[in-house]
Amino acid sequence: MSEQTGKVDDSQSPPKVQKKLRKGDLVKVDREKYSNSLESKASDTNLPEYIFQGPGEVLLIKGDYCQVRWRRPVPDVWMNSDHIVSY
């Protein structure tokens, strides 16, 4: 703690590491991360609510993208792994 301000110094703490996604993991889309992304600017703004509520299942992982299957009769989608979080 800094003596002058009484705040915790975060520079000494280790960086937060996001759990690496694996095939079969249950996930959902993080609304805040997705809405601030380049992909959201290029896509329809009226997204279905179920992608934010989850769960979706990771089917494949290629580079920075994951193929996600939702538990609904809809096509599988490829999402940037930065935009999805564990359910």
UniProtKB/Swiss-Prot annotation:
Catalytic activity: a plastoquinone + NADH + (n+1) H(+)(in) = a plastoquinol + NAD(+) + n H(+)(out); a plastoquinone + NADPH + (n+1) H(+)(in) = a plastoquinol + NADP(+) + n H(+)(out)
Bilayer disposition of the protein: Peripheral membrane protein
Top-level taxon in the UniProt lineage: Bacteria
Pfam families on file: NdhO (PF11910)
Residue stretches of biased makeup (Basic and acidic residues): 1-10
InterPro entries registered for this protein in UniProt: NdhO
EC number: 7.1.1.-
EC main group: translocase
Entry keyword Zinc: no
Keywords of this entry: Membrane, NAD, NADP, Plastoquinone, Quinone, Thylakoid, Translocase, Transport
MF annotations from Gene Ontology: oxidoreductase activity, acting on NAD(P)H, quinone or similar compound as acceptor; quinone binding
Location of this chain's protein in the cell: Cellular thylakoid membrane
GO cellular component: plasma membrane-derived thylakoid membrane
Protein task: NDH-1 shuttles electrons from an unknown electron donor, via FMN and iron-sulfur (Fe-S) centers, to quinones in the respiratory and/or the photosynthetic chain. The immediate electron acceptor for the enzyme in this species is believed to be plastoquinone. Couples the redox reaction to proton translocation, and thus conserves the redox energy in a proton gradient. Cyanobacterial NDH-1 also plays a role in inorganic carbon-concentration.
Assembly description: NDH-1 can be composed of about 15 different subunits; different subcomplexes with different compositions have been identified which probably have different functions.
Protein family: Belongs to the complex I NdhO subunit family.
Protein name: NAD(P)H-quinone oxidoreductase subunit O
Organism (species): Prochlorococcus marinus (strain NATL1A)
